Amino acid sequence: MQEFSLWCDFIERDFLENDFLKLINKGAICGATSNPSLFCEAITKSAFYKDEIAKLKGKKAKEIYETLALKDILQASSALMPLYEKDPNNGYISLEIDPFLEDDAAKSIDEAKRLFKTLNRPNVMIKVPASESGIEVVSALTQASIPVNVTLVFSPKIAGEIAQILAKEAQKRAVISVFVSRFDKEIDPLVPKNLQAQSGIINATECYYQINQHANKLTSTLFASTGVKSNSLAKDYYIKALCFKNSINTAPLEALNAYLLDPNTECQTPLKTTEIEAFKKELKVHNIDLENTAQKLLKEGLIAFKQSFEKLLSSF
């Protein structure tokens, strides 16, 4: 399916040197993403960083982090570069800016430009959260011809606004990362069984429509947070349900491996807007508004990434 791409939402030194290469070589994935939580998990729990951390002792915590993270990003970039050279729409790895700069547009822009210049790779995307100041950062980076991954997108309204900016200004590849499963984790305990495990897909589909309404050929919807939060769902539930044209799904390894055992042979047809509106009306019967939920989840996501980054820095 040329219209649909699968990326890997995982980064860790041993993985990059082994299974990551296997996934690329067999055509299973054509890109990857990272975030502060993934780096925290990898660096604090994997033995493959210990020697390098020991050699960096005495340096500032953020300097240690950047030394380790940028090495991983460069390694992923090199592995993906043949895909990028074949098709500049594929072969990207994403690196997120310091979560603690989230509410300071000027400092975020400076850091993003510094990181992109340091890495000096055309297939690196800078990840920017979809906060109020983050949208300003996205505009500045796209004008500077830096590929961007706009992350923590929960609201269709915000997705549309970002797509409009990218449609006017994007000169390089861009993706809008729509988070999915966190909606179901939030809403499912509040609704009857017949409405469960649907809110994330419904909301993501509405975001997809908003993005496609405005986006240019350089911009795609990237479905993120596609690992299941419930044991009752198939591990690849969100990949299969959101296998749409001109979209990407970045998935954790468990979901990715499950999907590869029985992949879709063709793209899914998204729900109609009338079906989306009907579902939202049903949610309102239970006093649930998806836009309000989106705002809550964005705030929680920003806090979670800060907490992960702080935990990682304090580990040094």
UniProtKB/Swiss-Prot annotation:
Tell me where it resides: Cytoplasm
Q: Does the keyword Ribosomal protein apply?
A: no
UniProt keyword annotation of Transferase present:
yes
List the CDD domains.
Transaldolase_like (cd00955)
Keyword annotations for this protein? Cytoplasm, Pentose shunt, Schiff base, Transferase
Q: Where is the active site?
A: 127 (schiff-base intermediate with substrate)
| Single GO biological process annotation from the record | carbohydrate metabolic process
Q: Which InterPro entries match?
A: Aldolase_TIM, TAL/FSA, Transaldolase_2, Transaldolase_AS
User: Which PROSITE patterns does UniProt cross-reference here?
Assistant: TRANSALDOLASE_1 (PS01054), TRANSALDOLASE_2 (PS00958)
Signal peptide positions are none
Provide an example Pfam family for this protein. Answer: TAL_FSA
* EC number per UniProt: 2.2.1.2
Query: What SUPFAM superfamilies does the entry give?
Result: Aldolase
Catalyzed reactions per annotation? D-sedoheptulose 7-phosphate + D-glyceraldehyde 3-phosphate = D-erythrose 4-phosphate + beta-D-fructose 6-phosphate
Pathway given in the UniProt record: Carbohydrate degradation; pentose phosphate pathway; D-glyceraldehyde 3-phosphate and beta-D-fructose 6-phosphate from D-ribose 5-phosphate and D-xylulose 5-phosphate (non-oxidative stage): step 2/3
Show the GO MF annotations.
Answer: transaldolase activity
What top-level branch of life does the organism fall under? Bacteria
Q: Which GO terms describe its cellular component?
A: cytoplasm
The UniProt entry's sequence similarity note says:
Belongs to the transaldolase family. Type 2 subfamily.
Q: What does this protein do?
A: Transaldolase is important for the balance of metabolites in the pentose-phosphate pathway.
Q: What is this protein called?
A: Transaldolase
Q: Which organism is it from?
A: Helicobacter pylori (strain ATCC 700392 / 26695) (Campylobacter pylori)
